[in-house]
C-alpha cells in the first residue's frame, strides 16, 4: 500500500509479531518439509525449497531448525503427506482472491477458509472462477542499486520485466520456472536480493475506497490466521490517499 508498489497491493503481509511467531514458524516448516519431499533436499537444484529457506531465514528461523525440516521432508516423515490446494473466491468490492493452502485435511481447511469469506462480505467460488485473472510469476525484490546496471544484469539473466519503485527499490519479474537462474545471475552481478519467490500477478486490479479497503484487509487477516493458509493473493488496489485513512 505504500507508494505504488504492485507487490504491496497484490500481497498484503502482516508484521511478524512475537505473538504470531509460533504460527508463522509452523507454516514455514510445513513448506520446507513439503518442498524437500517434492523436489529433494538440494537447495541449489530445488527452487521451491530455496525460496522456502530464504523466507525462513528472513523470519529469523535458525539453520538447525531449517535443516531438520528438510531432513524430515527427504526422509518421508509422518508430516510429509501435505498437499497444496488453491481456493478461489470474491472479496469485498468484487475483488478476486486466491488462497494457497498446504494441508493434510481438505475438510478442515475448507471449514476455515469459507467462513472467512462469508464474514467479510465475500464468497468462496468454484475452481477457475478467478484463477484466470492471475498469472504465476517469479518476483525478485531489490532494496536499492544502480538502475542501469541492474536492468542490464536482469535482462542478461533472463528477466521479463524490471519496475523501479518510488522508494528506490526494484521489482523484477520472471517466468516462474526461471526464478532461480535469474536470481543467481543478478546476485553474480553484485546485487543483494531482498526477497525472491513465486507469486500470482493479477492481470487487472480493482481500486478500493476507504469503506471497502478495510473489509478486504480484514478478510486477508482472517485467512492468514488460518493454520493451513500459506499465501493470500488478490487484485485489490489501495491508493496512497485511501491507505492514509486506514
From Swiss-Prot:
It is found in: Cytoplasm. One of its GO terms (biological process) is regulation of DNA-templated transcription. GO terms for molecular function: DNA binding. GO terms for cellular component: cytosol. It comes from the Bacteria. Keywords: Cytoplasm, DNA-binding, Transcription, Transcription regulation. Belongs to the TACO1 family. This is Probable transcriptional regulatory protein APL_1151.
Amino acid at each position: 500500500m505504500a507508494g505504488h508498489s504492485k507487490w504491496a497491493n497484490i500481497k498484503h503481509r502482516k508484521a511478524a509479531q512475537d505473538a504470531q511467531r509460533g504460527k508463522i514458524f509452523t507454516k514455514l516448516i510445513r513448506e520446507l518439509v513439503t518442498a524437500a519431499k517434492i523436489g529433494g533436499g538440494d537447495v541449489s537444484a530445488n527452487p521451491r525449497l530455496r525460496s522456502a529457506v530464504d523466507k525462513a531465514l528472513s523470519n529469523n528461523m535458525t539453520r538447525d531448525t531449517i535443516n531438520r525440516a528438510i531432513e524430515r521432508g527427504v526422509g518421508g516423515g509422518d508430516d510429509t503427506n501435505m498437499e497444496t490446494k488453491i481456493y478461489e473466491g470474491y472479496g469485498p468490492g468484487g475483488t478476486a482472491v486466491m488462497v494457497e493452502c498446504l494441508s493434510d485435511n481438505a475438510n478442515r481447511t475448507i471449514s476455515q477458509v469459507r467462513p472467512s469469506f462469508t464474514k467479510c462480505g465475500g464468497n468462496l467460488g468454484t475452481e477457475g472462477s478467478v484463477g484466470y485473472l492471475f498469472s504465476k510469476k517469479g518476483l525478485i525484490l531489490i532494496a536499492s542499486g544502480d538502475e542501469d546496471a541492474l536492468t542490464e544484469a536482469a535482462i542478461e539473466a533472463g528477466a521479463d520485466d524490471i519496475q523501479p519503485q518510488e522508494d528506490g527499490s526494484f521489482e523484477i519479474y520472471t517466468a516462474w520456472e526461471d526464478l532461480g537462474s535469474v536470481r543467481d545471475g543478478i546476485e553474480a552481478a553484485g546485487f543483494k536480493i531482498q526477497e525472491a519467490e513465486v507469486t500470482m500477478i493479477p492481470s487487472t486490479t480493482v481500486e478500493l475506497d476507504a469503506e471497502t479497503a478495510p473489509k478486504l484487509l480484514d478478510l486477508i487477516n482472517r485467512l492468514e490466521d488460518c493454520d493451513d493458509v500459506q499465501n493470500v493473493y488478490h487484485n485489490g488496489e489501495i491508493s496512497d490517499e485511501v491507505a492514509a485513512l486506514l
